[in-house]
């Protein structure tokens, strides 16, 4: 169905947030080729149903596969929660059993026991990620002694997508959700940013955190997990091209994406506008 030639690593997100993961992966593995796809025209994914998120994510993965990607990272917690397993189990065997689609939730959960002293952890995420209970279920399987509290932060993604992460609205919504989750479980000592957009708010988040509570972002752990995965799967590593090239695709305005991406990457980039529906 797709070309068997070696190709780049694909990284997908519903918008800009996955760039925080892409940046950490590229820093850790600069020699590989990458294609980043942001479905900005249909963001946010958080409030959407399982069926819609699966359909959108499936379209994006197919697009990245058609561009030659052999491995795709869903750098979107909502897509990882609502679509990853179905794509892995239902679609990949028909498309190409040798290709892989990986998410960001499991690599994050694997670090949980190391980052918390009290073993009380808070997950800050979209409505879709929190309602799916993906984090709490994974943590319960790996670390049943850890207590997990989830907090849906529906306005945080729009704040980032609209470049308003240092606005009065950001102050209001960040403080509101931090106060609430820490009142539900005052023993929380670690907050996990369970959405790849949220690292852009990390400075604002730290302003409103009490002493003794730390913030845990995903990017570097996903990057380390990917390096480990490729070391353990040399057959996949051989299918990846190395030239240090990066392409950026968006389903919305290329100019708008390029301008916003400079906030995430601190670099001007060329962007292609595409359609995937």
Regions found by a protein language model. Name each.
Residues 1-277:
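Non-catalytic structural scaffold of enzyme domains
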């Amino acid at each position: 169905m797709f070309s068997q030639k070696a190709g780049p690593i694909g990284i997908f997100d519903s918008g800009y947030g996955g760039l925080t993961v892409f940046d950490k992966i590229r820093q850790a593995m600069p020699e590989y080729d990458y294609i980043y796809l942001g479905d900005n025209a249909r963001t946010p994914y958080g409030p959407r149903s399982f069926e819609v998120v699966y359909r959108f994510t499936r379209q994006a993965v197919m697009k990245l596969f058609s561009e030659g990607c052999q491995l795709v990272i869903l750098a979107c917690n909502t897509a990882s929660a609502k679509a990853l397993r179905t794509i892995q189990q239902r679609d990949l065997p028909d498309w190409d059993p040798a290709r892989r689609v990986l998410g960001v939730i499991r690599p994050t959960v694997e670090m949980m026991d190391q980052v918390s002293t009290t073993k009380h952890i808070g997950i800050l995420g979209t409505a879709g990620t929190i309602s799916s209970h993906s984090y709490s279920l994974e943590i319960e399987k790996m670390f049943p002694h850890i207590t997990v509290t989830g907090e849906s932060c529906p306005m945080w993604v729009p704040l980032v997508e609209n470049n308003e992460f240092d606005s009065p609205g950001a102050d209001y919504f960040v403080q509101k959700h931090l106060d609430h989750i820490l009142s539900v479980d005052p023993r929380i000592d670690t907050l996990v940013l369970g959405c790849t957009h949220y690292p852009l708010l990390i400075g604002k988040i730290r302003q409103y955190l009490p002493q003794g509570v730390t913030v845990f972002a995903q990017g570097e752990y996903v990057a380390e997990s990917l390096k480990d995965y490729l070391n353990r799967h040399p057959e996949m590593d051989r299918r990846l091209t190395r030239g240090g090239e990066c392409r950026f695709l968006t389903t919305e305005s290329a100019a708008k994406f390029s301008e916003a991406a400079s906030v995430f990457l601190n670099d001007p980039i060329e962007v292609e506008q595409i359609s995937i529906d």
